[in-house]
From Swiss-Prot:
It catalyses: 5-amino-1-(5-phospho-D-ribosyl)imidazole-4-carboxylate + L-aspartate + ATP = (2S)-2-[5-amino-1-(5-phospho-beta-D-ribosyl)imidazole-4-carboxamido]succinate + ADP + phosphate + 2 H(+). This is Phosphoribosylaminoimidazole-succinocarboxamide synthase. NCBIfam families: purC. It is an enzyme of class 6 (ligase). GO terms for biological process: 'de novo' IMP biosynthetic process; cobalamin biosynthetic process. It holds the Pfam family SAICAR_synt. InterPro entries: SAICAR_synt/ADE2_N, SAICAR_synt_PurC, SAICAR_synth, SAICAR_synthetase, SAICAR_synthetase_CS. One of its GO terms (molecular function) is phosphoribosylaminoimidazolesuccinocarboxamide synthase activity. It comes from Campylobacter fetus subsp. fetus (strain 82-40). The keyword Transit peptide does not apply. It comes from the Bacteria. Keywords: ATP-binding, Ligase, Nucleotide-binding, Purine biosynthesis.
Length: 237
């Protein structure tokens, strides 16, 4: 499968058009690390390949449980073929344990187990700092077609969480929270898109609470690659 031109470059990936396949794209995972809306930047060799492998494994798991995804195939260490879809400009954040912006915003002690799964929407706009938005904001800004779409996103977020939470528990990891994105394909179907990796999730070791995700970069806690390698090892074990 031949790449043509790069049509988009984000913080963690490059997207390429594919020769002879207008309905497909190639997603290339980068080694770049960013935090605090790209105010902090770095890079760690091999990080992109690890995220590609982790995300592929988790998307395949979710697909086996009935979640429709944009993933078609992984073609090498850093690249995967995905269905072309229109990305909904919302980050869907699913939280099980308080930390990060939730703890800061509401003064909830870090590590507090939430009484139920919390689903939040953040508007994808770097210039605005990806602000938290509610259902009414989403409708006013035409980010989705209807309230039914928002209900669908919430349902999918909780359904994905219900699959991943026990999976990671068996692997000795707490799934603290995660960010997912969705797209709409040419037939109007909502698909899980982007990635699920330690770049977009918070994982804590079940025994020690050691952080094994991008918070290691955010908070200068040590090697990102070593932690991501351990996450991959546990996922595949």
């Amino acid at each position: 499968m031949e790449k043509l031109e790069m049509i988009y470059e984000g913080k963690g990936k490059k997207m390429w058009s594919v020769k002879g396949h207008d309905d497909l794209l190639i997603a290339e995972f980068k080694d770049d690390l960013t935090a605090f809306n790209a105010e902090k930047k770095g890079s760690e060799s091999g990080k992109g390949a690890l995220n590609n492998k982790i995300s592929t494994a988790l998307f395949k798991l979710l697909k086996s449980k009935g979640i429709e995804t944009a993933l078609v195939d992984t073609i090498n260490d850093t690249e995967q073929v995905v269905k072309k879809c229109k990305i909904i400009p919302l980050e869907v954040v699913v939280r099980n344990i308080a930390t990060g912006s939730l703890s800061k915003r509401l003064a909830i002690k870090e590590g507090t187990v939430l009484p139920f799964t919390l689903v939040e929407f953040y508007y994808k706009d770097d210039a605005l700092g990806d602000p938290l938005v509610n259902d009414e904001h989403c409708i006013i800004m035409d980010l989705v077609k209807s309230e039914n779409d928002l209900d669908r996103l919430k349902h999918l977020g909780r359904e994905i969480n219900s699959i991943l939470l026990p999976f990671f528990k068996e692997k000795g990891l707490k799934l603290v929270d995660f960010k997912i994105e969705f797209g709409v394909d040419k037939d109007g179907n909502i698909l899980l898109a982007d990635e699920i990796s330690p770049d977009s999730c918070r994982f804590w070791d079940s025994v020690t609470n050691e952080k094994m995700d991008k918070d290691r970069f955010r908070q200068d806690l040590g090697s990102v690659k070593v932690a991501y390698e351990e996450v991959l090892r546990r996922i595949l074990s």
